[in-house]
């Protein structure tokens, strides 16, 4: 969810994920992701232009969900769906530790198993955090 041009999705596919669906609101990012998948011969990777919160309500949950939301975080509705869905794991990539903490507090059926902070923008206050979540 919030797939961008597919960096996490391609990595998951290369690691052996059976199928990967990337959901992104940007038509340009979806087109770029689908073009890259075709160019790399990754038929199991597909990108869809849709709102993440709306899309998840219409589809069955996968075993693993990767979310990479914008700085504003997951929004008010997606954490509730994540609490109720049947997914076994979540990888949460965040560019804003404050909204990550807020979203995790709203996801009370999940626990953080591992987390890493990445200082990808030295000399700035910006950082990336990756958290691996599992069911409580």
Language-model segments: residues:
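Rossmann-like S-adenosyl-L-methionine
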Residues: 1-136
């Amino acid at each position: 969810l919030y797939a961008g041009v597919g960096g996490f999705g391609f990595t998951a596919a290369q690691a052996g994920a059976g199928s990967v669906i990337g959901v992104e609101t940007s038509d340009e990012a979806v087109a770029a992701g689908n073009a890259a998948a075709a160019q790399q011969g990754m038929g199991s990777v597909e990108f869809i232009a849709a709102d993440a919160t709306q899309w998840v309500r219409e589809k069955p949950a996968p075993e693993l969900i990767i979310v990479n939301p914008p700085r504003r975080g997951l929004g008010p509705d997606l954490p509730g769906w994540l609490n109720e869905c049947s997914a076994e794991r979540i990888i949460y990539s965040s560019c804003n530790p404050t909204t990550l903490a807020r979203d995790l507090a709203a996801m009370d059926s999940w626990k953080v198993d591992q987390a890493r902070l990445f200082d990808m923008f030295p000399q700035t206050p910006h950082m990336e955090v990756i958290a691996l979540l599992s069911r409580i």
